[in-house]
Amino acid sequence: MTRLFRRLTALMLTVLLLMSGVGAAQKNGTAFSDVPEDHWAARSVRWCAEYRLMNGIGGGKFGLGLTMTRAAYALTLCRLMGWELVSPDKGSFTDNQDTEKWYYSAIETAYTHGALTGESRLCRPDDAITREEMAMMTVRALGFGVLSGTAAADCPFTDVSVARGYIALAYRMGLIKGVSRYSFEPKATATREQAAAVLLRAYDRLHATLTLDYVEQAPEGSVQAESITEMSGSVPVSPRAPLESVYAAACRAGEGGSVTLYAVPLEQTTRGGVVTGSRTLTAEELSALLAAGNMRSHHSEQHQSSCVYRAEKDGSVVTVWYESAADVMEKLELCRLLGVSAVYVIK
């Protein structure tokens, strides 16, 4: 929940900053002498400059054809997501300890928000970023790296072995393309204009229009995200559609399609790990339970679903599952990134 709140807050701040800066950028001009108007990346370069996602290299030049470093890309992701830069006294990587370096705070901020991971003690800030690293960092920055395992089977490229799930997600979100139908060239280094193209696509996805409606039944043609139907193993287990199901539904719906989420509050009684009873609740009943204060709260990051529960004297456990506004927004954001134009929520 905290992760989602930080991301949504950052995105709102980004919108305000960009809205205040676009007019000035247009007035001052953002043309670079080394980017021809007919170049395939001219639009991406221009808008990334106007949105303050990327700067030139000086002298009125963008640096067309130059490689993008990992540190520079981390900084652009901080700008894309609107993250407030952090500057801890000690760096998180052995090669990011100089607090005076221009990229120190960007690296630490990207690490704080999960775009960079601590799997290695090195972040290699001056290395040219590869295409697979760019896909991985972008998907993580957007907050959906958790789906990389699920998405791995969707990767259409035969030359990808290490980051299949991340590349599949970036491809599904329309952020990055292959060099051919079945080739991605994951180890190839990315140029500054290629990075600009990915950043602008991510920006456009994040700000795409998506309709949210609360309905009593799924509209015809809308793809419903499947909920868990078999309850077994440890409890509590959310009967809601997990993010994996929302991802699958959004992929089936396709660009411009719609997805339906089932979010009617559900009360379950379990004993010994077995569901012994269940019933749906009205919004009024849910509000009363949440206000009662005699139940413990829990949140499933995997399923993006909330619950409250209490233990009864007979050893059973009563659990009430529901979707909070933040839960719905997380799934809504995933659908937006995957090109869905409408989400219907059954409550």
Which residues make up each language-model segment?
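Acidic/aromatic/glycine-rich contiguous surface patches that form carbohydrate-binding/processing clefts
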Residues: 331-347
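Substrate-binding surface in catalytic domains of secreted glycosidases
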Residues: 213-289
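Alpha-helix C-terminal capping/helix-coil junction sites
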Residues: 49, 111-112, 171, 336
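Glycan-binding loop/region signatures in secreted carbohydrate-active enzymes
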Residues: 256, 260-331
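Feature responds to low-complexity, polar/acidic, surface-exposed segments characteristic
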Residues: 2-11, 15-42, 55-104, 112-132, ...
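Short, acidic/polar
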Residues: 218-222, 323-336
